[in-house]
Amino acid sequence: MSVAYKPEGYTSVAPYLVVDGAVRTINFLARVFDATELRRYPTPDGRILHAEVRIGDTVVMVADGNAGWPPIGAHVHVYVPDVDATYERALSAGAMSVQAPVKKDDADRRGGVKDAGGTTWWISTMQA
């Protein structure tokens, strides 16, 4: 019997977001993308050392920044069934608009928002 090299149900690549306000980011992901929290390791002062949430078929890892690992903005792309509804949920959850959903030169209708933790979320629905 061989030992698995990764947890069951995890993809080989997972975004790791180091943010300012990990709890706020986790709550945003739950509200906007229906993320399910899998793990949370808080520090004694309530910050998040490490957390994992599942969005669709992907695990996203989240942690609060610190002196050794400062928060850094990232861009993450997420496919959703309804880009317009998800974009509006993100704005209602406090995100700032980067780009309203629009169809350009590829098969996707895509919009972008930036959350309070500094992550830019590109939200798309394929419209072949």
Predicted regions: what is each one?
Residues M1-E8, L49, M61-A63, V78, ...:
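Vicinal oxygen chelate
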Residues P7-G9, Y16-V59:
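Core segments of cupin and vicinal oxygen chelate
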Residues Y10-A14, P71-H75:
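Short, solvent-exposed beta-strand edge segments and adjacent coil->beta transition regions
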Residues P15, L29, V53, V76, ...:
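Terminal peptide-recognition signature
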Residues R24, D84-A85:
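Alpha-helical macromolecular-interaction surfaces
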Residues T43-G46, G68, K104-D105:
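A short beta-turn/loop motif at secondary-structure boundaries
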Residues R54, W69-P70:
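Extracellular/periplasmic catalytic domains that process cell-envelope and extracellular macromolecules
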